[in-house]
Amino acid sequence: MAADEKAQANGEQAKGKVKKVVGGAAGNESLKGKGHAEESKGDLRAAKEKAKDAIKRK
């Protein structure tokens, strides 16, 4: 996985988790939903990079 892509994926995942927690604690469903979406985006980016790495190894 490219280091910059991995860092971006980890950053998106972390920001999403924080938004979910803050949104849940504050009762802000919009922020909680945005956090879930951002975390999912980070998960997808990480999965994409792992797939690219797996293809390169073959």
From Swiss-Prot:
SUPFAM superfamilies: Hypothetical protein YjbJ. This is UPF0337 protein SAV_738. It holds the Pfam family CsbD. Belongs to the UPF0337 (CsbD) family. Residues 1-58 are annotated as: Disordered. Residues 31-58 have a biased composition (Basic and acidic residues). InterPro entries: CsbD, YjbJ_sf. Coiled coil: none annotated.
